[in-house]
Amino acid sequence: MNKKIISALLCGAMVLSCAAPVMAADKAGDGQKIALVGKSAGNAFFEIAAKAFKETAEAEGATVDVVYPEAATADAQIKVLDNLISQQPDAICISANDVNALQAKLEEAMDAGIKVSSFDSA
């Protein structure tokens, strides 16, 4: 196999592990609403991971909304998280630009009953 295929498979497996606790909560992913938040639009790594995540979660009955911030900054991701918290998805899986800057907002999401997981976060 070439390196791109192996990378894509590994990315997909990693991202899917983020959804496992959410989809295990119900019978598979039936009715679960999951938001997948990227670092920025056009990030090749995230595009591959998001595609695999979305395909697998939707095959299990979940609905996945892939969301990108306006800029590759923590402040832009905070705006995305504010919007998502008001929508009350079952889970948010985020590739954080700055996990320390997002900590309070992610705790707010968890306090609102939203499951939160992170991957590829610095």
Q: What do these predicted ranges mean?
A:
Residues 2-10, 14, 22-122:
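A residue-level marker of the well-folded mature domains of exported/periplasmic proteins
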